Design a protein with these regions (language model features):
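Juxtamembrane intracellular "pre-TM" segments in multi-pass secondary transporters
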Residues: 1-30, 213-223
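Structural signature of the two symmetry-related core transmembrane helices
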Residues: 89-104, 182-185
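Helix-loop junctions at membrane interfaces in 12-TM secondary transporters
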Residues: 106-118
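A single, central transmembrane helix in multi-pass transporters
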Residues: 16-75
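Intrinsic disorder in cytosolic terminal tails and internal cytosolic loops
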Residues: 197-224
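Substrate-agnostic recognition of the 12-TM MFS/MFS-like secondary transporter fold
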Residues: 67, 75, 79, 117-168
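Transmembrane alpha-helix termini and helix-breaking/packing motifs in multi-pass membrane transporters
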Residues: 52-54, 162-181
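Helix-to-loop junctions at the C-terminal end of transmembrane segments
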Residues: 74-87, 171-172
Length: 224
């Protein structure tokens, strides 16, 4: 079998695993895409343009560093205290906290409040980041993990530049402030989807039976 047919088959299998075998896995994948696209647009375009227009481009580094430190601290805290709350509780708190942080950043406030928004976003993102990563590994059958993760990484690499390009068009046509508000609106939609999605209502349930998943994967391979 040639390289190209094998690659196409792996891509098709990866897509089926990510989007058709398990509700939690599907929602986790879609949320990951949404988060990468919106945050990539904020960090890669909106905030740099805002600080450059303000005449203080060097302040961007402090905002992004604050966000990263908050994410690191909350990830460590989640690892230590995760058993004290249900996964659903951590998930809901994280999504609401991230929405608050994005809303603060999207308002493009004075610098101290910008740092506050970055800190809130970073601290809130830790549990969600850990949970989404866990669901990806826990719900993907081992036999197709390489195909699924490879497909996800490929799609993410394509999604982020597309989102930044679309945001650049918005910034050019509407201005930085309006583009930031649009991104906040997109994040609100992501948060609403994350909270009401059927697959994310019982996050403490066990993963589906691996044998059933392997059967679905075998069917996907035969179809490809």
């Amino acid at each position: 079998r040639g390289v190209v047919p094998s690659a196409v088959g792996a891509l098709r299998t990866g897509i089926r695993v990510l989007f058709r075998t398990d509700g939690v896995l599907t929602v986790s994948t879609l949320l990951t895409f949404g988060i990468v696209m919106v945050m990539g647009s904020f960090q890669g375009l909106v905030l740099p343009v805002f600080f450059t227009d303000s005449g203080r481009p060097e302040l961007l580094g402090y905002v992004l560093s604050t966000m990263s430190l908050g994410l690191l601290a909350s990830s460590l805290a989640y690892a230590a205290f995760a058993p004290r709350l249900s996964r659903r509780t951590w998930y809901v708190l994280s999504m609401f906290g991230m929405l608050l942080g994005v809303a603060i950043l999207g308002a493009l406030p004075p610098y101290p409040f910008m740092l506050l928004g970055a800190l809130v976003l970073g601290v809130s993102a830790g549990p969600a980041s850990a949970l989404l990563g866990f669901f990806m590994l826990d719900r993907i059958p081992e036999a197709s993990r390489g195909s699924a993760l490879g497909t996800q990484n490929s799609l993410l690499l394509a999604a982020a530049p597309v989102a930044v390009f679309a945001t650049s068009v918005g910034v050019s046509a509407l201005g930085t402030s309006v583009a930031a508000i649009v991104l906040v609106g997109c994040w609100m939609a992501i948060t609403a989807f994350a909270l009401v999605a059927r697959g994310m209502r019982n996050l403490d349930d066990a993963a589906p039976d691996p044998k059933r998943e392997e059967g679905a994967l075998e069917e996907a391979r035969l179809d490809s």
